[in-house]
Regions:
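Glycine-aromatic micro-motifs
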Residues: 1-113
Length: 113
């Protein structure tokens, strides 16, 4: 869990934004520097997303240091494509995030003008 933020769909992709009292469930991987460089390219770092070091609370364990990609500012809310939405749902299922904490709310906010 990452605390004090919530999910948003911006330009049709997920990011997190500050939101006091809210939390976002996350999946955690240990990656090598080479893997990180590959993910950087995939995520459009540093132009589309930037990286931030965060404390992540692990279920059944304590906090760990982690890194998250956050979308650069200025991008409007926008609905995700069907393909991207299905990919996100699959990720939630893969990590057994059953109640989809905040995901449906982010989807609904993306519909608003």
């Amino acid at each position: 869990m990452i605390h004090n933020c919530r999910l948003e769909f911006r330009r049709g992709f997920l990011t997190i934004v500050p939101a006091e009292g809210s939390s976002v469930p996350v999946g955690v991987w240990r990656i090598s520097k080479a893997n990180e460089a590959s993910v950087d390219r995939y995520e459009g770092y540093p132009t589309f997303y930037y990286k931030k070091q965060v404390r992540v609370m692990i279920d059944g364990g304590g906090p760990v240091n982690g890194m998250v990609y956050i979308m650069q500012s200025g991008h409007p809310r926008q609905m995700p494509s069907d393909f991207y939405w299905r990919t996100v749902i699959q990720g939630y299922n893969d990590f057994a995030i059953g109640n989809r904490c905040g995901l449906q709310e982010a989807f609904e906010r993306a519909r608003l003008p």
